Structures are given as structure tokens and as C-alpha cells.
Amino acid sequence: MLGDLIMNFLLYLFAIAIGIITGGITSLIGASGVMVIVPVLTMFFQVSTHSAIGTSLFVDVIASLVVSYAYFKNGNIDFKSSIWIVISSIAGAQLGTQFASQIEESSLSALFGIVLIAAGIGLLIKSYKKNSNEKESPKKKIRFNKQWQQISALIVIGFGIGIISGVFGAGGGVMILLALIMILEFPLHKAIGTSTLIMTVTALSSTIGYASRGNINYELGCLLSVGAVIGGILGARYANKVNGNTLQKVVSICFMCLGVVMTIMEIVK
């Protein structure tokens, strides 16, 4: 009896620790915690895959909401861009899921891992080319003379991100971040804040769907969320204090590590 209580207590602490890691990842690279939470819940807590995904999305909503607020307080969210990207990415995701059904799952994960590695290397090289004392430039690579041109571009980008996210599954936050950095050349802090806000909305939409089918473990979700809030606050505090060049190095390393892990996991399967 006592042994069971101790074991349950340790498992709950473990869940909170995983939540802290998830919150940290979200605050630094705007990524979903699904790749961390789902394997942990299925292996250590005997939760079904569908319930694990639903619970992970539930935690994503909490974590990304907290992180978004932290970035908002520092003026690092572009609300106008967020609205158009959210609307168009939802439509694109529906098309992406149709493509995904025709592609082997292992190929998708390995390909996404390679994309993350390449993106990480690109960001790392770019960070070393910058002057360490140079301030982040608010200018974007694409200039628009009229508002409708900017809105059209955001819709196209959002639709494209939605397709990619639908194909790769839990990659929306990362793909949005990459698009904002690589295509529109958002300052990194603002790109992370904006992508995290967008992920809050998209994750909430998916969470409602899983909740309606009873595929959320609220007990574990709340424990993970406690950790995610702690990790999100600490990670966002660090991210908003460091300069863009340093943060870019951290983000690039996170991308490469995540990409390597995903690729290796698919190779050894």
C-alpha cells in the first residue's frame, strides 16, 4: 500500500518534470510538446495513443497561452499577422491531412526531422554571420506597398504552413516560426511570440475535438500543465532577456537536437 503511494507520487513528480520540459520547449522554439508527452504517457502511464495526443494538446493550450502572455508583455507579438495566418492555416491543414494519408508515417517523421536539422544548421550559420552587438532589425524581407498585398501574402503563407502542418502532424508551431523567420524575416523574439499565439488557437481547436470524444486524461493533463506553466514562464523570461543572436543559437541547437532524435527514432524502428 505504502509502496503504491510512493510510486504514484514519483510518477506525478515525473509528470510535472515532463511538463516543465514541455513548457521550456514551447517558450524557446514555439513547438508543441506532443513529441515529448505522447511517448511518456503511453509508456509510463499506460494511456492510449488517442488519449495521449488529446492530453498533449490540452497541455499545449495551457503552455502556449502562458508563453504568449509573457511575450505579449514584452511587445513581441504581431496580432495582425496572427489573425490571417490562423484563418488560412486551418484551411490548409485540412488539405494537408489528405496528403498525409497517402504518405507512410515513418517517412513523414524522418523527413520532418531532416527539415529541422537543416533549419537548425541554417539558423546557426546565420547567427555567426551577424555582429553580436547588432540589434535585431524590424524590417522584413518582403515589402508591401498596399495592405491587401501583405494580407494576401500572409494568407498564402498561412495556407502553405497549414498544408505542411497537416502533412507532418504536430509541427504547426515550428513551421510557423520557420516561415516568420525565413520568409518574412521577423525579429526572432517577435517570431516566437507570434507563432506561440497562433499555436494556442490551433491547439485549442484540436483539443475541443479530442475532448468531445473523451480522449483527454484531465488528471495527468493538469499535472503536466503545472510543470508546463513553470517551464514556460522560466523559458520565456530567459528568451525575452537575451539578445536575438544568442536566442537564435539556442533555437538552432534545439531544432537540430529535435531533428536528430526524430530521425534516429524512425531509423531504429
Language model region names:
Residues G54, S82, I192-G193, S252:
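Conserved glycine-rich helix-kink/hinge and helix-boundary motifs of the Major Facilitator Superfamily
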Residues M1-G24, V38, M43-F44, A70-I163, ...:
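Juxtamembrane transmembrane-helix boundary motif
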